[in-house]
């Protein structure tokens, strides 16, 4: 007798007539008049539960089996048999059921069998992975993460662990969470009355990182091809379906690479990870297509077979102006494209994923390489049909004098970036990279609209429960 996951039984990896034990939780129990109970047991290893057929001859049938409710944890031992019913190929003929844990009060158990609103599930985030929806999201999230690591490993990239605590603002936007051990009731002050951060833990101001990019660049300028994959933080007071205060980012950095090089890398990576989901999570994707977004599977299949379009920002503005569409946000050269503009380009005009390149310098970060026209920078956004921007990237400014001018232009103190500037002083090279918001990627794959529902414990304004 061996302990096996539910997925092994359902996919035929446990031999028919073999005796196995599965451990999991009760999804449902159905009793027949013939004295047989059908207990659906799931363990999270796949979307579908395993049906255990339980005869009333089991010694604990009356006292325990007939009292099993949704959420009870059980250990079922029995024989694998071909299932005569529809919905599953195999089931287990139970020879023993051990109740590991009861649900105290089935009437008040938040994850009872009925379907709950997604808003309610956020209030019970510690229990919501037990639902079909969040369980499927978790497995897809895992598959995407593993595929990302696999893709970069197969293409010669090294994973770099960049710090979560930093003194640098990568975006220069100032929307950062402060890290401090100072006593808020008794803050040390300088002679001018300002908070004296030299008394703080790090001897200076420190923050949670908004991006691993700058640190990633240092390793790209030594290992050539690297990527970071970890949590980032933005103290942006945005209560929208697209924003989180804590989220995960994938950020490759490539030495000796142009903007076009990383645009090609972005296309290759997205197609690779989407194909991995289609191959490895067919059961979960079937659920998303049936219950969440009927286009979920077809959208990924179209994406992996599409050729990416490319367009200059200036030309994209002309396309939008000539479209005849009435946009909520006015279109003119110099604006940051809004979601409606991005989606028009990807869904209506190009009808394919599209890379928009060479944005006005005034709406982009200091580290992006200035183009020869002096007005635009070598930046790109990858726009996907159905969501808009999914990746943002650029060629990095490798010329020290131009970088210093940009820092000054944006009111940033170049001395705060002394180590970043050193990369341009000692063997500088052209290099490029991009950032992919992992939760936005999961939202695109699953069709789950709100990013709060694709991360285990969402952190948003006024919400840091669990």
UniProtKB/Swiss-Prot annotation:
Signal peptide: none annotated. It catalyses: tRNA(Asn) + L-asparagine + ATP = L-asparaginyl-tRNA(Asn) + AMP + diphosphate + H(+). It is found in: Cytoplasm. Keywords: Aminoacyl-tRNA synthetase, ATP-binding, Cytoplasm, Ligase, Nucleotide-binding, Protein biosynthesis. Its main location: cytoplasm. Gene3D superfamilies: Bira Bifunctional Protein, Domain 2 (3.30.930.10), Nucleic acid-binding proteins (2.40.50.140). It comes from the Bacteria. GO terms for cellular component: cytoplasm. GO terms for biological process: asparaginyl-tRNA aminoacylation. GO terms for molecular function: asparagine-tRNA ligase activity; ATP binding; nucleic acid binding. InterPro entries: Aa-tRNA-synt_II, aa-tRNA-synth_II, aa-tRNA-synth_II/BPL/LPL, Asn-tRNA-ligase, Asp/Asn-tRNA-synth_IIb, NA-bd_OB-fold, NA-bd_OB_tRNA. It is an enzyme of class 6 (ligase). Its EC number is 6.1.1.22. The keyword Protease does not apply. Homodimer. Belongs to the class-II aminoacyl-tRNA synthetase family. This is Asparagine--tRNA ligase. It comes from Yersinia enterocolitica serotype O:8 / biotype 1B (strain NCTC 13174 / 8081). The gene is asnS.
